[in-house]
Amino acid sequence: MQNRYRGTAITACFVVGVVLFLTVGQALGQSSTYQAERTTDGKPNLNGIWQTMNTANWDLQDHPAYPGLPIGGAIGAVPPGQGVVVGNDIPYQDWAMEQKDKNFTNRLTEDPEAKCYLPGVPRATYMPYPFQIIQGTEKMLIAYGYAEAVRTVHLDKENPEPAPIDSWMGRSHGTWDGETLVVEVAGFNGEAWLDRAGNFHGSGLRVTERYTPISPNALMYEATLEDPDVYTRPWTIKMPLYRRLEENARLIEYKCIEFSEELLYGHLRKESGQ
C-alpha cells in the first residue's frame, strides 16, 4: 500500500514538473517575441501604473535579513532578498568601496530617503511604491508614488540637450529601439543613494534605461550605470515591472515625514540610553 502511494506521488510530482517546465518555457518564449499594444503613433504602449516586487531598495545585491533600530523590532527589519545586479558585483573603485561601507554604517541617518529627498534614477523605479507612465508622442511623464517625484522623458529631440542644472532626478532623453524604450539620463547632483545599504554614485553618473514589454502586464527593466569617478566599469541592474491591476488603480498622495522612526521611537531610545 505504501509503495502504491509512493509511486502515485512520484508520478504526480513528475507530471507537475513537466507542466511547470512547459509553462515557464512558453512564458520565456512569449517574452522574446511579444509585441505590445500600440499607441496612436505606432509605438509600444507603456501607459499604466507599474511596480517592482523585490527588495532592491533595501540592497541591490544579494543580502540576508538583518535588524534595523532595536526599538523598531520586526517593523524596521530588513527582509532578505536576491540581488538585481547582473553578476551581483558593483565595481567600486577602492576609495568608493570605503565610502560605501561608511554609508552602510550610518545608513539609518544618512540615507537621503530618510530625509525625504527625491530618490534619483534608477532608484525611483524600484522603491516599494507604484509609479505611473503617461506616454505622449513627444514627451513622457513618469510620476512616482514616493515623495511625489516626477520626471519628463524628452522624446522629441534627436540630440540630447545637457541638463541646465544638476538635480536629483537628472534630465531624461528617450528613443525607441524596436519594442524597447531606451532612456539616457544624466545631469545628477551626486547626492542620491541607490539603496538603503549605502550604494551610491557621483555627479558624473550616466544611466541608460531600457523598458521592454514582455507580456500585456509586465515590462523588463534594465539600467546600465556609468560613472568613471566612482566605478571601474559600467554595470547593469535588471528586474521585471508589473502592472497594477486593481480596479481604478491610481497613485495616492504621499506625504514624507523626515526621520519618522526617530519621531515615533526616539524618546524610547533616549530613555534606554542607546
Predicted features by range, described:
Residues 2-274:
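PEST-like low-complexity, intrinsically disordered acidic/proline/serine-rich tracts
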